[in-house]
Structures are given as C-alpha cells and as structure tokens.
C-alpha cells in the first residue's frame, strides 16, 4: 500500500517505520488487562453499577415539605440522566483531544476519532429526543413543585458548560446571564472546574492545528490554492457570460442576475484576500486560521480521494455536533416556553427570552465549517490533480 499520511508532510522511510509504529502503540488507548484471579471472583450486576446508591438519590423537594408532587420524580430523573450523558460526552471529547494533542496524529487513530465523534452525535440525538419525555409533564403539573427549586437553574449544569468550553466556545462570545459573567452563578468548586476547562486547549484549536498539517496544500510544485482560485475565476466569468447571452431573460432579470453574480464574486474575492481574512480573524468573526480554512476546502472538494475519506468524516461529524447542540437548545427553548411561558426562570433569568438568544450562530463552534459550503464548486469543474499528487493521495494494494 502506498500514499502519504494526511497530516504528515512526507512518507516514512523504512528506518522510520519502527518509531512510527511505536508512537502509534503508545497513542492507542488500550484497555487494561483483567487479572485472572479477580475475574474468578465475579462481579454482581447491582454492585458493579452501584444501583443501591444510584436509585436512592432522587430526593423530591415536594416530599420534604409534605406535599408530594408526582411529576417531580420525572423531572429529577430526566436531569440526572442528562448529567450522566454529559459525563460520557466529556469522556469522549477528552479522549479525542488526547489523541490529537500529540502530532502527527497516526492515520490508524483517525478511525478512533471518527468512532468517538459519532458516539457523541448519537448521545446528542438521544438528548434531543429525551425532551419529548419531559414534555409529557404539563404546565400545571410543573407548578406543583416549581417554586421549591428556587434559585437552582439548568444554567448551573457545570458539565454542559464544560462541554461547551472543551469544544471551543469562548467566554466573550457567551450571552450574559442576568448581566453577569457566567461564572457568577456557580459555587467556588464549579467555578474552578470551569476556569480549568477555559485554560485547556479546546477541540477546535486542535482541529485547526490538525488541518494546518495537511501536506497537500503545497506538494512537489502543486499549489492547491492557486489551482482552486483559477477554477473559481473561470466559473464566475462563465456565469456572467451565460446571463448576458440568455435571450430568454428580460433586461430586469438580467440586471438582477448580474447583481447576484457580482455579489458572489465579491464573496470569493474576500476569501482570496489573506490580509482581509486575518483582519476578520482578529475581530473574532471567523475562528479557523487561513491555512486551516484552505485545508478544509481542499478536503471537502476532494473528499473522494482515499487520503481524505476519514478527514472529511471528521469535519462532517464536527458540524453535526454543532447542529445537534443547536437543535437541543432550540427544543429546550420551545419546551420552556410551552411549560412556563414568559415567566421568570427559577434562577432569576428571563427564562424563554434568555434561552432564545442562545439559539443561533453565536454559539456555533465550527461555524466556519458550515460556511465552507459557500465556496464549493461542482465536481466537473474541479482542477485535475497532478499525477504525483494523486498517487500520494491514493491507496494501492498489490500482491507480490
């Protein structure tokens, strides 16, 4: 089998293979071996899962005050279940960050990353669907015990805030909660935990570094960006010519179509202006570095090349995580409006009105990956890859 690794600028020579194999072995997260003697002792289901503790930690406030509310048990279990799944998501995110934090990431482990990102998205789908269960509780049912929850709030889910931080949300992009920094609503222990996650290298930062290592942006005389720009320029010019040559269009329609085509040209001209792009980067309007953006566009355009199969899946799953986070926020917002209307939240926030501000691009971590669709071109217009590049992107099997 021949071909370069995606995130390595060279193919390993024979004398390097041993060290690479050793690094892969170290990076692979191996399960600990099970001692034969301990295995013979056996494990009891309830003891292993700590069910005695788990099933006895649902303490209803309504019971404590002598006015049991049937729906409070559902409310507690739903939120405890959310926190368990949040813990699993953090476990997966941390493992992915660990793999990507020691470059170059071995190709073998890219499959592990895909698997774990996929697991995160499946958990997220479950979290979105779980809202439907909570919605079986009516507004009147909730009012039976709602006042007993003050001043607790779902905003205080430290694990959810940790997930946001670990993925790459920045503190200054958050909508202020009751005009205060979000740290203000957590106890000292949780504040320290949140601050620690803010100081960690986020998944977004690691993805940017990973993209920047793409060796095929410039490879043995091949300049992807120059080739791509030439193709785009030709497409835009052809669009203008087709509009002018179309006699079925009225002059007004031609003028409108020409205006749209020129607007498209302006969008691409901004893309090809590195100085202008970096100014946007400084302002926080974009998050990907210019080189990382180029790399992502290359992967999206040539996703059918074997070397880019897995990187494309990784990028696609990252956008899916963002999409599902937005879906969860939206469903949560609609549920809150449905159950409490415009009432003030138990934590003192504006409730529905605050939650509505969190549904949008402001909270998307991988927004730049979504916007790449604006810069993709049809397959039949893609510049042909030079033979030397295509050979290195390919995987070839042969029997000696």
Swiss-Prot record:
Molecular function terms, GO-annotated: heme binding; metal ion binding; tryptophan 2,3-dioxygenase activity
The UniProt entry's GO biological process terms, in alphabetical order, are: L-tryptophan catabolic process to acetyl-CoA; L-tryptophan catabolic process to kynurenine
The residues the record assigns to binding heme are: 332
Keywords for the protein's UniProt record, in alphabetical order: Dioxygenase, Heme, Iron, Metal-binding, Oxidoreductase, Tryptophan catabolism
Q: Which cofactor does it need?
A: heme
Q: Name one Pfam family in it.
A: Trp_dioxygenase
Pathway the protein acts in? Amino-acid degradation; L-tryptophan degradation via kynurenine pathway; L-kynurenine from L-tryptophan: step 1/2
User: Does the keyword field hold Hydrolase?
Assistant: no
* UniProt-annotated binding residues for substrate: 75-79, 146, 346
Swiss-Prot/TrEMBL catalytic activity: L-tryptophan + O2 = N-formyl-L-kynurenine
Q: Which domain of life is it from?
A: Eukaryota
What PANTHER family does the record point to? Answer: TRYPTOPHAN 2,3-DIOXYGENASE (PTHR10138:SF0)
The protein, known as? Tryptophan 2,3-dioxygenase
Lineage at the top is:
Eukaryota, Amoebozoa, Evosea, Eumycetozoa, Dictyostelia
